[in-house]
Amino acid sequence: MLSKQIPLGIYEKALPAGECWLERLQLAKTLGFDFVEMSVDETDDRLSRLDWSREQRLALVNAIVETGVRVPSMCLSAHRRFPLGSEDDAVRAQGLEIMRKAIQFAQDVGIRVIQLAGYDVYYQEANNETRRRFRDGLKESVEMASRAQVTLAMEIMDYPLMNSISKALGYAHYLNNPWFQLYPDIGNLSAWDNDVQMELQAGIGHIVAVHVKDTKPGVFKNVPFGEGVVDFERCFETLKQSGYCGPYLIEMWSETAEDPAAEVAKARDWVKARMAKAGMVEAA
């Protein structure tokens, strides 16, 4: 993995649902992926992972060692339900506790990057106070992450507060901390009125990973590859020419499909073909 190969991963929700990480990582290996990104979303089932016992955490670490497939990142979308910008003090406190537990979990199992959802609030009306609370919550979160040596990385979202790399960079400059970086989603970035290539270039030096999916304006999930507006070849070329050498993660939600593995294999081949056209020959 320290060669010039492009690290290519798959999102947990693309693979069959379940809690056996050995089976999940074995399937990812069979499908040719280097890593799997874990999801801790707003459902009680996935949130409960943050309360795993020592034995459960060790089982994940052992599965990683046995398969050679890493789990280097976590997509922490639980803050939709418990936002850091909430005006309800109890909800906000829960959001901060989820952050603390996620950072501790990451430290325990070797996760290096926690991808954050860029919502001040999601189910409520946003205002200046929710944005202030969100900024303060991020500051407190980054302090915790610094002590644990875990990187918090902001996703470029399906939401106006954080729908461009330029906006996320504003938070990076505000926090001014090496443990806060960016994790752009080229699908979300392309669905808004952004100069996508300029945005990607602006983020170089702060981008720690890239989500790969297709989108349409106003449609941010479950758009089949090749049917949306994303110019994948150009995005890959821009990132390569700008010096980005980090991981790419195919983001899909096919865990409930009739044959998730077949859906993932089809997407993998499609993405790798675009990578090869962009001159990322190691991915071909």
Swiss-Prot record:
MF annotations from Gene Ontology: intramolecular oxidoreductase activity, interconverting aldoses and ketoses; L-ribulose-5-phosphate 3-epimerase activity
Associated pathway: Cofactor degradation; L-ascorbate degradation; D-xylulose 5-phosphate from L-ascorbate: step 3/4
Domain of life: Bacteria
GO annotation terms (biological process): L-ascorbic acid catabolic process
Induction: Induced by L-ascorbate. Repressed by UlaR.
Catalytic activity reported: L-ribulose 5-phosphate = L-xylulose 5-phosphate
Assigned keywords, A-Z: Isomerase
EC assignment: 5.1.3.22
Role noted for this protein: Catalyzes the isomerization of L-xylulose-5-phosphate to L-ribulose-5-phosphate. Is involved in the anaerobic L-ascorbate utilization.
Membership in a protein family: Belongs to the L-ribulose-5-phosphate 3-epimerase family.
Protein name: L-ribulose-5-phosphate 3-epimerase UlaE
Provenance organism: Escherichia coli O127:H6 (strain E2348/69 / EPEC)
Top-level taxonomy: Bacteria, Pseudomonadati, Pseudomonadota, Gammaproteobacteria, Enterobacterales
